[in-house]
Amino acid sequence: MSALPNTHEVLLRNAHLLNGRPALLGVSDASLLPRCPVPGIAMTEHAGLWQILSHDTDWAGCFGYEPDRQQQGSCDTVVVFLPKARAECELRLALARYLGKPGAALVVIGEKKEGIAGAIKQFSVVAGEVVKVDSARHCQVWCGRNTQPLTEFRLTDWLSWTELSCAGVALSVAGLPGVFSLGRLDDGTRMLLETLAESPLGVDRVFDFACGAGVIGSWLHGFHQLAGKMPIRVDGTDVQAQAVFCARESYRKAGVNGEIFAADGLAVVQGNWPAVISNPPFHTGVKTDTSMTEQFLAQVAAHLAHGGELRLVANSFLPYEALIRQHIGPVEKLAQDRRFTVYRAFRKKSG
């Protein structure tokens, strides 16, 4: 059996805290669940893990921060695994209060390098007196028992909007705690959009892999409208629950034509497009992880029409150029600086 993340190992070390029906918020490894003493609710933001949880007959799954109404006030113990973003900790604690019964125990587990010390200040605001019950595997475990439950929890109450502009195109982007580049346009995406203005795709359908909050699709929609070009459809996918929610909201507000769906990579994606575009992630939590993009590059040709274009922005130090050349074809650098590079490649036409 493969090793669990440190936070999950520490929970099992303190399994005595799981009294009654538990809720585990922020599960990152499904193999934790059968090792817990009793089943309950398991929440994950990761689409691939959600697919695994959805087939579990014992645990009730929750994809991100949209619980079923009947899950409100149903848990005796709620465990919060510390998220990367401080603002998301507040969101996760609010969900914990919604799921917990009156008098439920609230447990927070996090690694020291992930900022557990700062999170405890947030924890004490909602749980009153909190006590550290363990410290192991570079993690701390804190528990509070005076948490006031929430009778209402609406993800839309946490939604924010940011007005952005790039290459003469204005757009509104939805945001939630934990979403990439919340409240701003990251420099890599800006460079990518600028190349789209200078060297348009010239197609009517695009697939946006790792679409985040829907920035690229919203921008393409606005760019085509502003230039009087043909309408464009931009479908997108992302692995994170908040990103999928925000992208759908961004598309709805802008009137973008396209479908946003949750997926871990391309395995469940059907069809192909004349252009695929991406600003892919290279972090899992606080760790560098390029495996998702490497897998994407190995599979994306099957979703590109013959002669179709892949356009991708990435940090310049990441080793993607050779992979693009291997799986798609000759590579061109449309823009580059010390930090980012925009690559373009075309799938070879058949015959």
From Swiss-Prot:
Q: Which UniProt keywords apply?
A: Cytoplasm, Methyltransferase, rRNA processing, S-adenosyl-L-methionine, Transferase
> Do you know which Gene3D superfamilies this protein is assigned to?
Vaccinia Virus protein VP39
GO MF, any single term: 16S rRNA (guanine(1207)-N(2))-methyltransferase activity
Could you say which EC number(s) this protein's record lists? 2.1.1.172
Q: Which reaction is catalysed here?
A: guanosine(1207) in 16S rRNA + S-adenosyl-L-methionine = N(2)-methylguanosine(1207) in 16S rRNA + S-adenosyl-L-homocysteine + H(+)
Record Pfam families: MTS (PF05175), MTS_N (PF08468)
GO CC, alphabetical: cytoplasm
Q: Which SUPFAM superfamilies match?
A: S-adenosyl-L-methionine-dependent methyltransferases
Q: Provide the protein's localization.
A: Cytoplasm
Give the family from UniProt: Belongs to the methyltransferase superfamily. RsmC family.
Assembly notes: Monomer.
What exactly does this protein do? Specifically methylates the guanine in position 1207 of 16S rRNA in the 30S particle.
Q: What is this protein called?
A: Ribosomal RNA small subunit methyltransferase C
**What is the protein's species of origin?**
Marinobacter nauticus (strain ATCC 700491 / DSM 11845 / VT8)
